[in-house]
Amino acid sequence: MEQLTHHAPWVKWIPVQADSGAFFYNIPLERLQNFKCDEILCLYQSLSGQPFDKEPYFQHTSFDQYKYIKAGVPFLNKWKLAECIVRDSDREQAMYDKVVTNEHYVVTHLNASHSTAGFDSSIIPEDWQIIPITSDGYIFDWLKVIEGAESIIMTDSVMSNLVDQLNIGTDRYYIPLNHIQLTPVFGNDWTWLDNPNINPNVKIFRSS
């Protein structure tokens, strides 16, 4: 909550306490109704007990495309993130000074909410520093570190979306983690790597 208000102060952020399930939908809906909002849009692609999968585009779009269609917003606006956030150069510099010790370095982010991606690390030069993005600080604190990297290696996460939406770097590597509906649409060039840790069930099409 704190980092959201710090970097997107134009949004009225409403905290909701996590519980056994109602916080996903019922409580947020009630809070918004109490604020007498003119329009309430639920951007969940799927949620138990809710008919979101009945939308005609559900079976044919990725999760991020689904949200933009639902909201009636052009999908290309996904890459206008820079216009929507306020960067904090002091926090970014502090993170840079804390983690960067070699001018030649690669930034990695391999941990997702439910899995850790793998890759052949021999592609990284031995004299380069490897900087894994951690939960330290705000996610936006890492922007200067990422911008200074000679290579970026990431899996399906908020960080890879951030890099793509802000078009950071040119030598970018993406490690897939989910099936096509839960994989984000990227607008910039990435080299895709095999993920030895991927769940085989996420593969929709298989060769015999």
Task: Label the predicted regions.
Residues 1-208:
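Catalytic machinery of carbohydrate-active enzymes
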